[in-house]
């Protein structure tokens, strides 16, 4: 019934939102009962308070920024109420998506041909060392293969070099549960090394002078996390060979591909030990590979290996962080802002910060407990070292100031445990290794545990008596150290096999601090080969140069795509190379994924406009009791008939309706007294109305929870709300009484104002209170107003006003309707002398002003009460002194003149006005108010 919005209804000047609309805002259609006559109205939905320059009287406007509802009356938009409430429940789960087809399996690269295994030869002399092969040329880049099926989880990547310190990231979501750690193997027997020679006794040092008091040290930098040690391979039994000649320094070769796993070689004669090779040249920095073509988006697979670091992207949008709502002066359009207090993400649009979503995620699952390692093998206790010479006692230094506590360094990863070596002959003693580079200064360590008591040293020679020193000053009491964090519990290793105790080696000289070299890139982890044949221990090779550090890539912006359906498990693909460690991305947490197997949860739809509640549908199957039919109109008066001839005396007929006073007839003959007529037949029952159409079967997932009906006048306090959802409130004020008097005809009472299925969002943590109004009581020489009916939920107060009592000449005014003290509509006026009351006033189908009572007699007749929809006002009593009828309410016809509600209401006449007094009869009572609240879990 609503036409399209015309352009002339749009504003010709800027409204409070700063935008002049040339098209109509979204509209919502509301169905109005067919028996209600009203002008075509429109409902506007927009942001901000409406401007009076658009819209017509009777239109509605919803401000989506505040959920305030406005009604236009007399050219002005009036605030009706606020439709805000608690958030609705989650929507139903969307259907499970179709299963994606398996992707094509990528072609596996060919494995190089394995050399034939040689037969065990007879003892032969060791041949000369072959020349180093030329460096192969770089192969051309292969085309992108088809998308392969998901491969098995790759081996743990080697730790990359420490990246530059990034800016503090946002708190990320808890990661996926890690896989259990690999269980280490047990160590095997090792040969006992030769006992080192006893070092000569050092000369007695001179007495040092007292040092100056040192300045307070600056806080040390946090140490880098240690790399994971490579896993050593096991050696096999072999005879010890002679030491070979020292080879010339070879060029540094390119990094070779990982070869296939070779078979175990047969035992062979021991070769001579080669000389220590010279230090290789530093290799050139490898060229950066080309980017692959972008493939089509496939089904989402399981979590893959860490990808290669991408090229540097262009500068993106700024992401700001703070506590609380961002200031309008902060940032530029397009920037994002994260409120650290609430987890809300804001975007700046048109110079305003608009909340977008919350990035706070759910807590992840607890990871599985790692496997317990096997026990380590027992090792023999080393021999006791020779006691050292007793040094001179130094002077007591000044107490240094307490340094700041350094940051606790990251715990290094546990190195892989090497496999056990098979029994082998003891190798020659290795030469003294070069001194390693000094590591960066670590943070101050926590106080170590008390060591075990050492063995008693041999008694030294008696020293000369020293001079008596001066008594030192008492030192200040040191500050209590902060309690250190509890360290992680290490994995228990297996017990090692018994091994011979090694001799104590000589103490090497202290080397000169070398310059710290650049950290080299970490190579791929090679495939573990089988145990080789026994070989002599070679000399320790020189340390290679440290590779250049790769350039740091830009931080990528995380744009989360839609979650794909879980694909079938693909066949096992080839193991990929370990990717370069990427920089830390900004932590913008996505939505928590659904449990596997279950379909994705549908996106939460944007909040729709709150529609006005339509008419209540018929109950499924069993039909609701139909509304009471309208009272038929009084038939029109017929013309006066001609005087008929005297007929035969008939049986006494039914009493006819009172006719008009006829002309005086001629006196007839006196007739015989007639027999008493038989009782007339009972009138036929009215025809049954047409059967209503069968309603649709009610849903088994009904949102309806229950209803509360308050049909007795009085107070109802702190009543329980059974659900968090929406409540539809129907309420009516009490009716006013008719004016009482016996000397003339007086006005009828007005009906109460009403709410019909008015929607209010509620929470089960709330309660509601209500007052159901008492009907206006008759009183001689006057009338009484019906009481108001009120409902209070939180800070919302709905008031359905009681109807006014009639006066000596006019009918009572109907009850008004207000929300939080603001009048939404007034009641309809009562009729003046001899005139009917005005029918109910509609603001919309949810709010109704009460109908007015009929006016008192004007010397000829009184007026009827005003109507409401299907209910009619009370009929005025006849005669020059007849009383006016009462106004009709939401639930009942008005009471006729000179009648009213009984002292104990029958429960069906809620809110109706009492009839006016007349013809010697007092005026009638008004009927009491009523409240009904229907609770639903969702609109």
Curated annotation (Swiss-Prot):
**What transmembrane ranges does the database entry give?**
none
Q: Which UniProt keywords apply?
A: Collagen, Glycoprotein, Hydroxylation, Repeat, Virion
- Give Gene Ontology CC terms: virion component
Positions with biased composition (Basic and acidic residues): 96-110, 123-182, 189-230, 237-260, 267-288, 297-314, 360-371, 378-416, 423-491, 498-527, 537-552, 560-580, 589-684
Q: Cite the post-translational modification comment.
A: May be hydroxylated on lysine by the viral-encoded procollagen-lysine,2-oxoglutarate 5-dioxygenase.
Reply yes or no: does the keyword Glycoprotein apply.
yes
Disulfide linkages recorded for this protein, renumbered to the chain, are none
**Where's the Collagen-like domain?**
88-147, 148-207, 211-330, 364-423, 427-486, 493-552, 564-622, 638-697
Question: Which InterPro entries is this protein grouped with?
Answer: Collagen, Collagen_Structural_Proteins
- Indicate where this protein is primarily found: virion
Q: Where is carbohydrate linked to this protein?
A: 15, 35, 39, 82, 788, 820, 858, 919, 925
Q: Name one Pfam family in it.
A: Collagen
Segments of this protein annotated with the region Disordered? 84-332, 358-697, 896-923
Q: Report biased composition (Low complexity) as residue ranges.
A: 84-95
Which cellular compartments is it found in?
Virion
Ranges of compositional bias, category Gly residues: 910-923
Asked if the keyword Chloroplast belongs to this entry, the reply reads no
PANTHER family given for it?
Answer: COLLAGEN ALPHA-1(XXV) CHAIN (PTHR37456:SF3), SI:CH211-266K2.1 (PTHR37456)
State its role.
Answer: May participate in the formation of a layer of cross-linked glycosylated fibrils at the viral surface thus giving it a hairy-like appearance.
Query: What name goes with this protein?
Result: Collagen-like protein 3
Its ancestry begins with: Viruses, Varidnaviria, Bamfordvirae, Nucleocytoviricota, Megaviricetes
């Amino acid at each position: 019934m609503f036409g399209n919005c015309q352009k002339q209804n749009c504003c010709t000047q800027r409204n409070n939102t700063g935008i002049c609309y040339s098209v109509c805002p979204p509209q919502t259609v509301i169905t109005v009962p067919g028996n209600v006559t009203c002008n075509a109205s429109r409902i506007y939905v927009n942001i901000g308070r409406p401007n009076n320059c658009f819209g017509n009287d009777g239109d509605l406007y919803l401000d989506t920024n505040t959920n305030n509802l406005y009604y236009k009356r007399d050219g002005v938009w009036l605030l009706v109420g606020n439709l805000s409430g608690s958030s609705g429940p989650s929507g139903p789960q969307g259907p499970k998506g179709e299963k994606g087809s398996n992707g094509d399996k990528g072609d596996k690269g060919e494995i190089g041909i394995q050399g034939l295994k040689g037969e065990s030869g007879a003892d032969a002399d060791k041949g000369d060392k072959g020349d180093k092969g030329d460096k192969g040329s770089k192969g051309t880049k292969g085309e992108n293969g088809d998308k392969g099926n998901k491969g098995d989880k790759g081996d743990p990547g080697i730790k990359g070099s420490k990246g530059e310190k990034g800016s503090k990231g946002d708190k990320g979501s808890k990661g996926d549960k890690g896989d259990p750690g690999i269980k280490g193997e047990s160590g095997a027997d090792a040969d006992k090394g030769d006992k080192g020679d006893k070092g000569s006794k050092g000369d007695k040092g001179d007495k040092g002078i007292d040092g100056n008091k040192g300045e307070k040290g600056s806080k040390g930098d946090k140490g880098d996390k240690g790399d994971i040690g490579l896993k050593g391979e096991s050696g096999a039994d072999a005879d010890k060979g002679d030491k070979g000649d020292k080879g010339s320094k070879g060029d540094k070769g390119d990094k070779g591909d990982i070869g296939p796993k070779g078979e175990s070689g047969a035992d062979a004669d021991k070769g001579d030990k080669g000389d220590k090779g010279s230090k290789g040249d530093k290799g050139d920095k490898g060229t950066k590979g080309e980017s692959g073509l972008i493939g089509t988006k496939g089904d989402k697979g399981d979590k893959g290996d860490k990808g290669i670091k991408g090229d540097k992207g262009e500068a993106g949008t700024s992401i700001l962080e703070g506590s609380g709502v961002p200031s309008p002066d902060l940032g530029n359009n397009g920037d994002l802002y994260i409120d650290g207090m609430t987890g809300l993400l804001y975007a700046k649009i048109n110079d305003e910060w608009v909340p977008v979503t919350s990035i706070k995620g759910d807590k992840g699952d607890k990871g599985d407990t790692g496997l317990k390692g096997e026990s380590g093998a027992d090792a023999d206790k080393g021999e006791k070292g020779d006691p050292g010479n007793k040094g001179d006692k130094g002077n007591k230094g000044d107490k240094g100031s307490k340094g700041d506590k350094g940051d606790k360094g990251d715990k290094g990863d546990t190195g892989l445990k090497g496999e056990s070596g098979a029994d082998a002959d003891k190798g020659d003693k290795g030469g003294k290794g070069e001194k390693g580079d000094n590591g960066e200064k670590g943070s101050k360590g926590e106080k170590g545990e008390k060591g075990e008591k050492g063995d008693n040293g041999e008694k030294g020679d008696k020293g000369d008596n020293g001079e008596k020193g001066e008594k030192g000053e008492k030192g200040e009491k040191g500050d209590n150290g902060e309690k250190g964090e509890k360290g992680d519990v290490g994995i228990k290793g297996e017990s090692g096999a018994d091994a011979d105790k090694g001799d104590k080696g000589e103490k090497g000289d202290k080397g000169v601090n070398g310059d710290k070299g650049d950290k080299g890139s970490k190579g791929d982890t090679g495939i573990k080969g089988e145990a080789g044949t026994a070989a002599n221990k070679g000399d320790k090779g020189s340390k290679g140069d440290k590779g250049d550090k790769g350039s740091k890539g830009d931080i990528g912006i995380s744009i989360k795509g839609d979650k794909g359906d879980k694909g079938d498990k693909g066949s096992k693909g080839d193991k990929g190379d370990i990717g370069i460690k990427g920089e830390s991305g900004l932590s913008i947490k996505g939505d928590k994924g659904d449990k596997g197997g279950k379909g994705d949860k549908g996106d939460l739809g944007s909040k729709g406009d709150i529609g006005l509640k339509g008419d209540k549908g018929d109950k499924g199957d069993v039909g609701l009791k139909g509304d009471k039919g309208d009272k038929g109109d009084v038939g029109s008066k017929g013309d006066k008939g001609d005087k008929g001839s005297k007929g035969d005396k008939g049986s006494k007929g039914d009493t006819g309706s009172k006719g008009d006073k006829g002309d005086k007839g001629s006196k007839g003959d006196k007739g015989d007294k007639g027999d008493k007529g038989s009782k007339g037949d009972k009138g036929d029952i009215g025809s049954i109305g047409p059967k209503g159409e069968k309603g649709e079967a009610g849903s088994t997932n009904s949102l309806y929870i229950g209803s509360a009906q308050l049909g007795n006048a009085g107070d109802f306090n702190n009543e329980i709300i059974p659900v968090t959802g929406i409540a539809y409130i129907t309420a009516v004020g009490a009716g006013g009484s008719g004016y009482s008097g016996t000397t003339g005809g007086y006005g009828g009472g007005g009906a109460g104002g009403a709410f019909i299925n008015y929607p209010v969002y509620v929470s089960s943590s709330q309660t509601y209170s209500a007052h159901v109004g008492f009907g206006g009581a008759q009183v001689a020489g006057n009338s009484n107003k019906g009481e108001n009916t009120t409902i209070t939920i939180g800070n919302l107060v709905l008031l359905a006003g009681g109807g006014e009592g009639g006066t000596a000449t006019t009918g009572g005014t109907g009850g008004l309707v207000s929300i939080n003290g603001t009048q939404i509509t007034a009641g309809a006026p009562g009729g003046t002398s001899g005139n009917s009351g005005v029918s109910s006033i509609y603001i919309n189908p949810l709010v109704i002003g009460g109908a007015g009572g009929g006016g008192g007699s004007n010397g000829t007749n009184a007026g009827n009460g005003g109507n409401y929809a299907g209910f009619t006002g009370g009929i005025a009593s006849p005669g020059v002194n007849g009383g006016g009828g009462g106004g009709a309410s939401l639930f009942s016809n008005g009471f006729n003149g000179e009648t009213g509600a009984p002292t104990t209401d029958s429960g069906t006449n809620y809110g109706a006005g009492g009839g006016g007094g007349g013809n010697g009869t007092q005026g009638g009572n008004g009927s009491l108010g009523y409240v009904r609240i229907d609770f639903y879990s969702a609109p």
